[in-house]
Design a protein with these regions (language model features):
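A short alpha->loop->secondary-structure connector
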Residues: 142-144
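Histidine-centered divalent-metal-coordination microenvironment in nucleic-acid enzymes
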Residues: 119-138
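Polysaccharide-binding surfaces and accessory modules of carbohydrate-active proteins
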Residues: 150-205
Length: 360
C-alpha cells in the first residue's frame, strides 16, 4: 500500500477576557505578528496568495513545515500541519500547533486575559469553525462518482467515533431570495455566511455527538464559505504530474484525544485506498447524507439508524463495518499503519455496539 500525503488544518476559537486588548480579530493579528516578527519561528508571506482571502502578511510557513495564518473567513487563527505520511507524525504536528499557540499567548499576553479553544463551535454567536483534513488521492475518473459518494457516506457514519461532542444545538434560518440577490453586485467573491442564512439556538437538543452537523448544508460543494459541505474535491495539485489531487474534508472537528485524531484520519486513509482500487460500491450509499449526519449526531438512543439509498436501513456501526470488512479483506498486512488502524477500528465498533463506556 502506497504512502499517502495527509495533513490537518485547525481553526482555533478565541475568547478575550481583557477588554483593553480589543476584539478577538485584533488579538489574533497581534499573536501572528509576535510569531513571525518577534519570535521569528517562520517566514511571513510577503506577497498575497489571494487578493481577497490570503493577503500579504496574513501568515506564513513555520520552521517545522507547518503554516500559521489568519483565516480571512471569520478571522480565526489557523494552524496547518506539514504534509506527512504517518499517523504518529500527524498527531505530533497537530499537538505541536497547540503548544505553539500556548507559547504565543504566554509570551505576548497571558492565559488569564486570552484563551484559545480547540473546539468547533461558538455557543455565544452560533458560529462554527472546523478541523479540516487533506488527503492526496488518485481515483480514476470513470469511478469518481461511485468513489466520492461512498466516501461521503463513510464520513457521515464515522461521526460515531470522530465527533467532538457538544451541549445543545443550532437551527439555520434561511435568508430570503431577495437578500441573496442583493449580493450579486459584488466584484469580489466575498459573500459571507451571514449574508445567506442566520443561526439560532435549538432548545430541543440537550447533547449531540457533533459540533458542526447542524451547520452542514451539502454533501459536496466547491463554494465552501456559505455552502458548508462534507467534502470539497479540490482540482489543485501540489505534488507532481501523476494525477494526484487534494481531497479536502470540510466536515471535521477538533478532537482533543490524540487517539481519536489518529483513528479518524487512519480509517479515512484506508477507505480512500479502497476507492483508488475500485473496491467501493453503491451498497454503502446513504439516501440523504446531510440529514443522516444530523440524525446520527442527535440520536440519544445510540442506535444511529440511517436510510440507505437502496431503500433499506442500517445502523451507523454496521455501516462502518461494511468498510471495515473490505479493509480487512484487501488491506490487512499491507504495511504502514494499516494493521493498527484495522485492529482499533474493529475494537471501537465492537465497544460502541456492546458497551460504549469501555471507550472512556
Amino acid at each position: 500500500m502506497r504512502e499517502r500525503l495527509m495533513g490537518l488544518e485547525v481553526e482555533y476559537g478565541c475568547l478575550v477576557r481583557d477588554a483593553s486588548l480589543g476584539r478577538p480579530e485584533q488579538v489574533v493579528e497581534l499573536l501572528k505578528d509576535y510569531a513571525f516578527n518577534d519570535l521569528q519561528i517562520g517566514l511571513v508571506d510577503r506577497h498575497a496568495r489571494d487578493f481577497a482571502f490570503e493577503p500579504a502578511q496574513a501568515g506564513g510557513f513555520l520552521t517545522n513545515g507547518g503554516r500559521l495564518y489568519i483565516d480571512a473567513v471569520g478571522d480565526h487563527l489557523e494552524y496547518a500541519t506539514p504534509e506527512v505520511t504517518r499517523l504518529d507524525d500527524l498527531v505530533a504536528h497537530d499537538r505541536a500547533g497547540q503548544r505553539t499557540l500556548l507559547r504565543l499567548v504566554d509570551g505576548a499576553l497571558s492565559r488569564d486575559a486570552v484563551s484559545f479553544h480547540n473546539n468547533s463551535i461558538d455557543h455565544f454567536g452560533g458560529h462554527t469553525f472546523g478541523c479540516h483534513e487533506n488527503y492526496a488521492v488518485s481515483i480514476p475518473s470513470d469511478s469518481l462518482r461511485v468513489a466520492l459518494t461512498s466516501v461521503v457516506s463513510f464520513l457521515v457514519s464515522r461521526l460515531i467515533y470522530a465527533g467532538a461532542g457538544r451541549v445543545g444545538g443550532h437551527r439555520l434560518t434561511r435568508g430570503s431570495p431577495r437578500d441573496l440577490a442583493r449580493q450579486g453586485h459584488r466584484v469580489l467573491d466575498t459573500l459571507w455566511v451571514g449574508d445567506v442564512y442566520g443561526v439560532e439556538a435549538d432548545p430541543g437538543v440537550r447533547y449531540q455527538l457533533s459540533q458542526r452537523a447542524d451547520h452542514i448544508r451539502h454533501a459536496m460543494s466547491g463554494r465552501v464559505r456559505f455552502n458548508r459541505a462534507i467534502i470539497n474535491p479540490k482540482s489543485d495539485t501540489f505534488c507532481d504530474l501523476t494525477g494526484e489531487w487534494r481531497l479536502h474534508v470540510l466536515f471535521g472537528e477538533s478532537n482533543m484525544s490524540q487517539y481519536a485524531t489518529a483513528l479518524k484520519v487512519g480509517t479515512t486513509g484506508l477507505v480512500l485506498t479502497l476507492a483508488e482500487l475500485g473496491l467501493l460500491s453503491d451498497d454503502t450509499w446513504l439516501a440523504r447524507p446531510v440529514a443522516s449526519l444530523r440524525r446520527i449526531s442527535r440520536d440519544e438512543s445510540h442506535r444511529w439508524i440511517v436510510a440507505l439509498a437502496d431503500g433499506g436501513s442500517i445502523s451507523a456501526v454496521d455501516h462502518q463495518r461494511r468498510y471495515l470488512e473490505l479493509a480487512q479483506r484487501y488491506l490487512a498486512g499491507c504495511g504502514g499503519d494499516a494493521d493498527w488502524v484495522i485492529g482499533e477500528w474493529s475494537r471501537v465498533l465492537d465497544d460502541l455496539e456492546g458497551d460504549p463506556r469501555r471507550l472512556v
